């Protein structure tokens, strides 16, 4: 991507008033620049949930990991982020007023593919909702109950149960039963809670 296109894209991101679309555009721009160097990025955590739920949950920043095995050398990372006039360090950056965290390799346990969606400057990858759901439920109950994580998990489940996002529930069960999580009962409980609120059947509830 040449300097003129980058400048135009940054102006577009700066002018965007919708925070979710702003994150989407920034993720698209950053992904395009890293892809030119052979590294595929994926939006993770609350940032992925914000985009998947179309803003029902607002994360307030943008978190990305690399989906390819290798990341870029320090000098090359600085060079790319310099093209965006980013301020900060190797992981934590500020670009046109947005906080962008470029983390390490993505950690995924689900056997489903990353979600790929169209975006203004090229497609972006989003973390698998099966992973996101189990992870957020873990955060809800880890070291006491986190209301923020709980609200986030419920909004994700509501979008899924509303039919706007397909999820492999067998994978949710399998991931939740892994030693890294072991929180299937908590997942079943939270999904049923949202299902009851929506007056639909919980796909995790045993018949």
Please place each PLM-identified region on the residue numbering.
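Compositionally biased terminal segments of proteins
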Residues: 1-207
């Amino acid at each position: 991507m040449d300097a003129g296109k980058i400048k135009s894209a940054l102006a577009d991101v700066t002018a965007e008033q919708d925070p979710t679309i702003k994150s989407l555009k920034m993720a698209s721009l950053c992904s395009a620049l890293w892809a030119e160097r052979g590294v595929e990025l994926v939006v993770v955590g609350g940032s992925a949930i914000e985009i998947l739920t179309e803003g029902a949950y607002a994360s307030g920043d943008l978190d990305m990991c690399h989906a390819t095995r290798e990341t870029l050398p320090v000098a090359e990372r600085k060079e790319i982020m310099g093209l965006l006039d980013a301020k900060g360090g190797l992981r934590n950056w500020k670009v046109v007023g947005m906080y962008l965290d470029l983390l390490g390799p993505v950690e995924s346990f689900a056997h489903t593919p990353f979600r790929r969606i169209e975006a203004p400057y090229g497609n972006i990858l989003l973390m698998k909702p099966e992973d996101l759901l189990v992870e957020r439920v873990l955060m809800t109950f880890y070291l006491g109950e986190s209301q923020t994580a709980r609200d986030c998990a419920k909004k994700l489940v509501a979008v899924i149960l509303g039919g706007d996002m397909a999820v492999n529930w067998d994978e949710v069960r399998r991931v939740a039963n892994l030693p890294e999580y072991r929180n299937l009962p908590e997942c079943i409980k939270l999904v049923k809670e949202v299902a009851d609120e929506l007056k639909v059947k919980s796909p995790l509830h045993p018949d």
